[in-house]
Amino acid sequence: MTFSVAVAGASGYAGGELLRILADHPDFDIRTVTAHQNAGQPLAAHQPHLRSLAGLTLSESTAENLAGHDVVFLALPHGKSGEIATQLPADTLVVDCGADHRLEDPDAWAAFYGGEHFGSWAYGVPELPVGAGRQRERLAGAKRIAAPGCNASAVSLALAPGIHAGLIEDADIVSVLAVGPSGAGKALKTMYLASEILGSANPYAVGGTHRHIPEIQQSLRKAGALSPTISFIPVLVPMSRGILATSTARVKPGVSAAQVQAAWEETYAGEPFVQVLPAGSVPRTSDVLGANTALIGVALDAAAGRVVAVLAIDNLYKGTAGAAIQSANIALGLAETAGLSVNGVAP
């Protein structure tokens, strides 16, 4: 069976990555592409690399244009997805790549986003430990899915094994991320100009203001944390796409380096898209470019009494579009790996 697909926000980076992956998916047929400001223009004017889809024309991002498809992917700014989603049929699988349906706590939404809280949907990080199982069990058969924030999934996947195994403390977590500017979207902003980025590293949203903080805390609570606190520092670096998240947490007394390595390996054993590197190895962003793969290196800093977990993902692939499509595969009962690449692009 082939499922008809519509993608809203198709002229942006996340929308373009969705289309790039979906174009070669064996079970999905792209029927409609929409973009509010660019309606009426050819898709090729905004996504010239998608040659197999060059004949498509962008239409308005309205519920009327999106309804009638089996699957709708929303790659819209926060606030916009929630408005449209309420108008779509209940039997349509809707996957929101924006923030509108990630947070369960309306107070956290009000504090970090503001505006109307549209409620939470099944969270699209299948590998996340939840109780005795995984988040994928909550995605099976779902009709509404919230794809994760790219930074949030990077930190959560990096630290969840230690939380779940009871090896690390959930207070005093520190995460420093090197991130590419594509995570901020295509909208023109001075700080993302090449002349501002090249040859520079630029911290932003410092001091506990980044919107992915409550999402990370929510995921770590699902993994077993009681009251997680995190100092989260993203740093904009001159690479178009990619995240290298270095996260540290206090280790509990008596935990050995072997126990740490084993906990991470056991948590992700058999996972097709999350791989733990051998002890002593750390990942690079170049190793996951263009792949739905997360690579993790973990070590015990015995002198500091902390575990250090380093995770690399492609923010547009595994961090956004790949996670959305992986979750949709699960919801529809397809092979979880369908249409998704585990191999990166090099050089």
UniProtKB/Swiss-Prot annotation:
Could you tell me which SMART domains the record lists for this protein? Semialdhyde_dh (SM00859)
The active site annotation covers: 150
Keyword Cell membrane listed? The answer is no
Give a yes or no for keyword Oxidoreductase in this entry. yes
According to its record, what are the GO cellular component terms? Answer: cytoplasm
Q: Which reaction does it catalyse?
A: N-acetyl-L-glutamate 5-semialdehyde + phosphate + NADP(+) = N-acetyl-L-glutamyl 5-phosphate + NADPH + H(+)
**GO molecular function terms listed in the Swiss-Prot or TrEMBL record:** N-acetyl-gamma-glutamyl-phosphate reductase activity; NAD binding; NADP+ binding
Look up the record and name the pathway of this protein. Amino-acid biosynthesis; L-arginine biosynthesis; N(2)-acetyl-L-ornithine from L-glutamate: step 3/4
Query: What top-tier enzyme class does this entry carry?
Result: oxidoreductase
Q: State the family named in the UniProt similarity comment for this chain.
A: Belongs to the NAGSA dehydrogenase family. Type 1 subfamily.
Which PANTHER family does the record match to this protein? Answer: N-ACETYL-GAMMA-GLUTAMYL-PHOSPHATE REDUCTASE, CHLOROPLASTIC-RELATED (PTHR32338:SF10), N-ACETYL-GAMMA-GLUTAMYL-PHOSPHATE REDUCTASE, CHLOROPLASTIC-RELATED-RELATED (PTHR32338)
Purpose: Catalyzes the NADPH-dependent reduction of N-acetyl-5-glutamyl phosphate to yield N-acetyl-L-glutamate 5-semialdehyde.
Q: What is this protein called?
A: N-acetyl-gamma-glutamyl-phosphate reductase
User: Lineage of the native species?
Assistant: Bacteria, Bacillati, Actinomycetota, Actinomycetes, Micrococcales
Task: Give the encoding gene's name.
Answer: argC
